[in-house]
């Protein structure tokens, strides 16, 4: 009985040993899901527009408004109508200035009333005289009526340029710093007026349209004063045609008609114009003197633009 028992034990041990040494079936490899890259996970260099945003035009268009009152009574404004007009344009956000000649300052019974009431609206008083020697007198008269004349020579013959400088009247000294307007012949005949927009510094009458940083006075160009030309200028800036830091344009209204000079455009058309211009983020509403100050602060880069 021992032999069969021994043989059985040998067979059992052999079977166990075979089970221990036989390799187990290979485990299946772990499954990995394919992960698609998110667009935001791309390296920055793969997106040039993200790394280098497109440049935007930083040009600013400074639009002012002005009116000249001459010495002839037949073209003087009705004081009440003019004040109502100034109330309307300033309520729109515009900045206005008025240049009045000696005849009106001395002859209009309500001159002081208009000066003070308009200044309360933010209107400035420029110096506009047909006789160059009367500029200090005009400034003096404005102060005597409670006003605050600024440093703008508003309108002049180009031939007078070389004689511009500080003047004193009755102990009051007035010093010019800014020029607006300029004509090569009296009477504003066709082809006489300098109708450029933009700003520059002229050195002399002979080089009136050329920028020279050695000059003393900032020339603020008013352009043609026409609403449609202002629209064209704004659209040109929007299209990137000009890259000057500061460009100027001025609306000019006749005192007796309260319409844009050489035009039938009145307050309704001006309101439409202002609303259109307000859609451009680069438009600023300022007066003439503030335009010159902004240009200086922006680096005094000449921006003369012919509009004739």
Model-predicted segments: where are they?
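Active-site-adjacent pocket scaffolds in enzyme catalytic domains
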Residues: 144-256, 297-305
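Sec-dependent bacterial lipoprotein signal peptides
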Residues: 1-16
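Alpha-helical scaffolding within the catalytic cores
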Residues: 77-85, 105-118, 198-207, 228-239
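Ser/Thr-rich, Proline-interspersed low-complexity disordered segments
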Residues: 10, 18-56
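Short, solvent-exposed mixed-charge patches
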Residues: 18, 307-308
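Metal-dependent polysaccharide deacetylase catalytic core of the NodB/CE4 family, i.e.
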Residues: 92-167, 176, 183-185, 248-258, ...
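Active-site beta->alpha N-cap acidic-glycine motif
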Residues: 50-117, 244-293, 299
């Amino acid at each position: 009985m021992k032999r069969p028992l021994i043989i059985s034990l040998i067979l059992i041990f052999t079977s166990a040993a075979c089970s221990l040494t036989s390799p187990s079936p290979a485990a299946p490899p772990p499954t990995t899901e394919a992960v698609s890259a998110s667009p935001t996970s791309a390296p920055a260099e793969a997106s040039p527009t993200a790394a280098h945003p497109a440049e935007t035009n930083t040009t600013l268009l400074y639009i002012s408004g002005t009116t000249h009152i001459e010495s002839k009574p037949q073209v003087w404004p009705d004081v009440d109508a003019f004040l109502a007009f100034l109330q309307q344009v300033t309520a729109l956000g515009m900045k206005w200035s008025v240049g009045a000649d000696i005849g009106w300052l001395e002859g209009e019974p309500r001159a002081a009333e208009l000066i003070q009431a308009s200044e309360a609206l933010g209107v400035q008083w420029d110096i506009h005289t047909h006789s160059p020697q009367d500029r200090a007198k005009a400034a003096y008269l404005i102060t005597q009526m409670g006003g605050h004349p600024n440093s703008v020579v508003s309108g002049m013959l180009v031939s007078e340029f070389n004689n511009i400088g500080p003047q004193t009247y009755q102990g009051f000294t007035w010093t010019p710093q800014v020029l607006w307007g300029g004509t090569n012949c009296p009477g504003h005949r066709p082809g006489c007026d300098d109708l450029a927009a933009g700003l520059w510094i002229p050195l002399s009458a002979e080089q009136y349209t050329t920028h020279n940083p050695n000059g003393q006075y900032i020339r603020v160009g008013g352009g043609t004063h026409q609403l449609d030309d202002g629209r064209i200028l704004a659209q040109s800036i929007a299209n990137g045609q000009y890259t000057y830091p500061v460009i100027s344009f001025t609306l000019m209204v006749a005192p007796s008609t309260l319409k844009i000079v050489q035009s039938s455009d009145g307050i309704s058309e001006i309101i439409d114009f202002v609303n259109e211009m307000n859609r451009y983020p680069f438009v600023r509403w300022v007066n003439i003197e503030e335009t010159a100050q902004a240009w200086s602060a922006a680096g005094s880069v000449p921006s003369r633009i012919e509009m004739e």
